Amino acid sequence: MTDMNIENRKLNRPASENDKQHKKVFPIEAEAFHSPEETLARLNSHRQGLTIEEASERLKVYGRNEVAHEQVPPALIQLLQAFNNPFIYVLMALAGVSFITDYWLPLRRGEETDLTGVLIILTMVSLSGLLRFWQEFRTNRAAQALKKMVRTTATVLRRGPGNIGAVQEEIPIEELVPGDVVFLAAGDLVPADVRLLASRDLFISQSILSGESLPVEKYDVMADVAGKDSEQLPDKDKSLLDLGNICLMGTNVTSGRAQAVVVATGSRTWFGSLAKSIVGTRTQTAFDRGVNSVSWLLIRFMLIMVPVVLLINGFSKGDWVEASLFALAVAVGLTPEMLPMIVSSNLAKGAIAMSRRKVIVKRLNAIQNFGAMDVLCTDKTGTLTQDNIFLEHHLDVSGVKSSRVLMLAWLNSSSQSGARNVMDRAILRFGEGRIAPSTKARFIKRDELPFDFVRRRVSVLVEDAQHGDRCLICKGAVEEMMMVATHLREGDRVVALTETRRELLLAKTEDYNAQGFRVLLIATRKLDGSGNNPTLSVEDETELTIEGMLTFLDPPKESAGKAIAALRDNGVAVKVLTGDNPVVTARICLEVGIDTHDILTGTQVEAMSDAELASEVEKRAVFARLTPLQKTRILQALQKNGHTVGFLGDGINDAPALRDADVGISVDSAADIAKESSDIILLEKDLMVLEEGVIKGRETFGNIIKYLNMTASSNFGNVFSVLVASAFIPFLPMLAIHLLIQNLMYDISQLSLPWDKMDKEFLRKPRKWDAKNIGRFMLWIGPTSSIFDITTFALMWYVFAANNVEAQALFQSGWFIEGLLSQTLVVHMLRTQKIPFIQSRATLPVLLTTGLIMAIGIYIPFSPLGAMVGLEPLPLSYFPWLVATLLSYCLVAQGMKRFYIKRFGQWF
């Protein structure tokens, strides 16, 4: 540590110190404006690297070269989280009250104690929490197993004492420290934020950061073949990505090689800072907000109804202890304690179904958010497009397809000795099978001038083996090629490049640009054939004859257009949020069927207030030249407008948006930070799986909402029945233990709901949580069952003479069976808006589970358990009345269902 100067400490102060400052300054940014020697001095390093001792000491100071990432909590924490639910808290409180009233107080008075109620409530708690834990634990474990464990290394220089004996070593990138000198070559990931010391034909792909599909050239100094001053420094107004003498962590080398010094590692890099900012507490998704609102609606309802039941029974019966126990049982009955388990089971089932389509669901609630999603925002490069440049046209200056232009382009690309860029590779792929073998053998490469950032051209000198003619073939950007051209070829004639012809050619290239194509010009010049060792210089790139043009495109994925159309048919609007330029973006969007009217750019977004942006995001479908924060701002504007928003992206620059979306979707080839920030990962490029995810999400939501509507309406009906019975009957219509057993059995019957199916009509549009709808459903549908509960009361009171305290067991047994059977039958009545069993049948698991529970319910009064809890066998004459009551209930419920749909326009 003693050998590290003060400047170095300032440069690489821990990220926590930088965070305290108002403006985020990255160490690498400052080094772009210093010479290589100044940077080495500030880092107290050397062109031959660090010694082993120096590297070891700095590793202790700065820590490992790792960025923040999420960790799956230990199993114990997951177990505790499974019980972290308001309904569980309510049940635990009720279990505590039951323990005091049924066990502790009687024990103190020397009376008989009873823990049955406590055990039943704790069974419900355990069943709900443990099943939820098991489902989520299995899903987390599967997601972790699918993460690739790749150990990446970097090549560094390690010098001996006295700056001698430097050797190259391969070390894990986690062990890199500021001051290390690293080597970069084609195919390498840039392992840290680095300042270039030396480079040759170095091209870096920054698409993962910027969304721009074309690589950019990087260089150690501004001196190059164009003759720039080596001390000239970059423009300070440039963005971090535009600085040519630095490379950022997470980008990759597409061609060339370089030597660079590490300036920042870990969380002090640009990439690390972004990773740190997105790891932590996630914003609440639409799913979370919906579950919370529904949960508190039901809890508020319970808090209102339970005191009413207590007061009515207490005053009418005079036994406040018994009334308290009964009110306690009613509270348990009103608590949908299986909601967390039903939710988890439904989500896990959806995740398993999606995994068969090679889709990994990392966060279970993303399944439901998928179904609720009504806006999908997507990046362009690598998601809608193939992230692979293709040659589309090879044309002469008149815009006519030309085999000569293709041949010249192929000779230029195939004759380059360095690593070829994406456009050269596209030309070579296109030329396979189109360039005759005789052509390949006929021309011999003699020399080349590599591409560089200033000239923006690449030239090769080839010799015709048949005639000995030598020809310079130059390929490059339109403006730079126009600067060195004096002629162009029109058919078989070579004519002067007049101002008129120049304008016509520029108009053609601009027209292709407007269609989203990248355009290069190809030109030639005949050179003197004398000399055995011909060489090229920049001076030779003059008086060129333009032969034609090449157009390139990163085409959309085959499934993109179909997927977007399918999403639109299912009520999901698609918006494109990209860092790429508007022209290229518009072309791709048109091809896949997205409206490109009035594209909004990042500059325009930045100038808007939140209110203005909230209005504009509803009108526009395409947003270009966006920064990561601008993408997030657009997402948040859509969410504030009430939309459930998904985001599909694969780059580092997409990570914040992926994290803030209600459902973040990425692909397997995405950056690690993008995959970590996402909720769902597509393992294959077929985007049609998005439609399947939407349908599966709606099916999952439907089965969850079934449970809530059934439970809420059924419980409300029961409470209404209890209030009526309590007001007119001199004894409790059902004991607390009866209600607890009934509720437990009903809960068990609900366990099969995740395996039920939804009607096709339900799946046609996005579905969202709405506590008001559930409350309305409860108030309208719940009392329907009360009609037949009251009918049963009258039946037991008048027909079977269970109208006094001595006959209360018979009365309670009759309502126990009718209540359980009607509550279980309601599963089939309410699961569909159609006629149950005829137009829409439940799945086999639901039929078996509900049938079994109904059979057990009928048997209980005849069993030893029934005798233990105060029930008694019913006469056979009761059952024809029961069948008639249940059939009447089905008919009335179906009629009420039709009225409700006509009145409110929907069922769920």
Swiss-Prot record:
Residues 1-20 have a biased composition (Basic and acidic residues). It is an enzyme of class 7 (translocase). It is found in: Cell inner membrane. GO terms for cellular component: intracellular membrane-bounded organelle; plasma membrane. The active site is at D379. PROSITE patterns: ATPASE_E1_E2. Residues 1-21 are annotated as: Disordered. It catalyses: Mg(2+)(out) + ATP + H2O = Mg(2+)(in) + ADP + phosphate + H(+). It is a multi-pass membrane protein. One of its GO terms (molecular function) is ATP hydrolysis activity. Keywords: ATP-binding, Cell inner membrane, Cell membrane, Magnesium, Membrane, Metal-binding, Nucleotide-binding, Phosphoprotein, Translocase, Transmembrane, Transmembrane helix, Transport. Disruption phenotype: Decreases Mg(2+) influx. Residues 1-80, 135-293, 342-704, 754-775, 828-840, 896-908 are cytoplasmic. It holds the Pfam family Cation_ATPase_N. The chain crosses the membrane at residues 81-101, 114-134, 294-314, 324-341, 705-724, 734-753, 776-799, 809-827, 841-860, 876-895. Residues 102-113, 315-323, 725-733, 800-808, 861-875 are extracellular. Induction: Part of the mgtC/mgtB operon. Induced by low extracellular levels of Mg(2+). Mg(2+) binds at E337, D650, D654, N718, N743, D747. Its EC number is 7.2.2.14. Belongs to the cation transport ATPase (P-type) (TC 3.A.3) family. Type IIIB subfamily. Mediates magnesium influx to the cytosol. This is Magnesium-transporting ATPase, P-type 1. It comes from Salmonella typhimurium (strain LT2 / SGSC1412 / ATCC 700720).
